[in-house]
Amino acid sequence: MKVYLVGGAIRNKFLNLPVQDRDWVVVGATPEILLSLKFKQVGKGFPVFLHPYSKEEYSLARVDRKIGVGHTGFSFDYSNKVTLKEDLMRRDLTINAIAQDNNGNYIDPFKGIRDIKNRILRHVSPAFSEDPLRVLRIARFCALFHHLGFRIATETMKIMSIVVKNNELLNLTRDRVWKETEKAFNTDNPHVYFQVLKNCNALSVIFPEINLVYQRQYYCIDNMYHNFYDTFDIFMGLAELSKISRDIDIRFSYLFFCINRMLFIDTSSYILVINQKELVRYFKALCQRFCIPAYIKNVSICFSRFYKFLSVIHYQSSKDIIMFFYIIDAWRKPYMIRKLSVLNNFCVSRNAYFKNITCQQYPRNFLKYAFNVANKISIKPILKMGFSGLQIKYELIRLRINAIENWRQNITVYKKCCF
């Protein structure tokens, strides 16, 4: 029995990146042998074992054979006759098909180290085309390593296009598509993920809304907010926002807010042809189709619904601001204020760029400080005054409105906080 370190740990070592997890492959063993050594078996499709002390994953060397459709239509042979090279051959990319033995020697039958040095994402074998999920994985890896200068090999991109042409992507579950997309959103350059999918024609299958935007070869002008949109600008914006925030819900909210607005602009008049309620209804359906988690959906819908209000919030009445806090349940979900502030400030700053004005004309911290002022109002004095029932709520609202009014009238403090 021999044990080898494989996969991402070796790849990241060559790239001088942090090693998150270490995966091991065991050659010449059986499940019974590992169980006798106190390993714990997990996994459904094929046996994976957790080390009794380190809890790192150990997998038996295996080969797979295509017997169905999608990324789950495989049978596995993990007998003790399977060799290390056979196991490495089934992996997606050459940079992930490198092993290291106990003496520190590298086993690299598919020239993965060379591809790491040359910054190339290359498939290991023609079997790459058997798993449609790998199309999304390669796009994600391209986004993950974009800052290092990685590119997809021409022959690999051709295979990805063939997989798409054969409608293999239709066999992927919505949940699995979202998991890969979520990981892509978590990279430093999530926009690259969508660009790769566009290049191999997968975007029209996975994200038809985004692909439709690509098909619009013109600038869209949103008269309501005086924004200029095109596909390049949207993804340039996503790239810039990703430098500001790593929150997936913030990144997702921005991307799909821009895209949805583009889809509902009349090209002849450049006017939004859908009202806010219809836009939110459409957005909810889109989130359901993509299996978007609730925490992302809530932020996205809230921003889409209240963007017009937020973009000029410093002109809104104190009463309307307090009512807005109640509508979004900010008292119990104060994190919404932070996320909406990031989104709103970013969009306003981009509007300022297109209108050639300075961002100093907009109170970037207004939303955050207004909420802090209102949130400091305590309910205890209200109770001591003998209020009960709905009277408590109404008095609390009144005091919060007055607090914001007094804060706004103090010009010195107001300007110091907001600008």
Curated annotation (Swiss-Prot):
Disulfides per UniProt: none
NCBIfam families: PRK13298.1
Cross-referenced HAMAP family: CCA_bact_type2
Keywords carried by this UniProt record: ATP-binding, Magnesium, Metal-binding, Nucleotide-binding, Nucleotidyltransferase, RNA repair, RNA-binding, Transferase, tRNA processing
Enzyme class: transferase
Function: Catalyzes the addition and repair of the essential 3'-terminal CCA sequence in tRNAs without using a nucleic acid template. Adds these three nucleotides in the order of C, C, and A to the tRNA nucleotide-73, using CTP and ATP as substrates and producing inorganic pyrophosphate. tRNA 3'-terminal CCA addition is required both for tRNA processing and repair. Also involved in tRNA surveillance by mediating tandem CCA addition to generate a CCACCA at the 3' terminus of unstable tRNAs. While stable tRNAs receive only 3'-terminal CCA, unstable tRNAs are marked with CCACCA and rapidly degraded.
Family: Belongs to the tRNA nucleotidyltransferase/poly(A) polymerase family. Bacterial CCA-adding enzyme type 2 subfamily.
Record-listed Mg(2+) binding positions: 21, 23
Protein name from the UniProt record: CCA-adding enzyme
GO terms, biological process: RNA repair; tRNA 3'-terminal CCA addition
Cofactor or coenzyme needed: Mg(2+)
Residues holding CTP: 8, 11, 91, 137, 140
Keyword ATP-binding in annotation: yes
A Pfam family reported for this protein in Swiss-Prot or TrEMBL: PolyA_pol
Misc note: A single active site specifically recognizes both ATP and CTP and is responsible for their addition.
Gene: cca
Positions with a binding annotation for ATP: 8, 11, 91, 137, 140
CDD domains found in the cross-reference section: NT_ClassII-CCAase
GO molecular function, one term: magnesium ion binding
Catalytic activity reported: a tRNA precursor + 2 CTP + ATP = a tRNA with a 3' CCA end + 3 diphosphate; a tRNA with a 3' CCA end + 2 CTP + ATP = a tRNA with a 3' CCACCA end + 3 diphosphate
EC code: 2.7.7.72
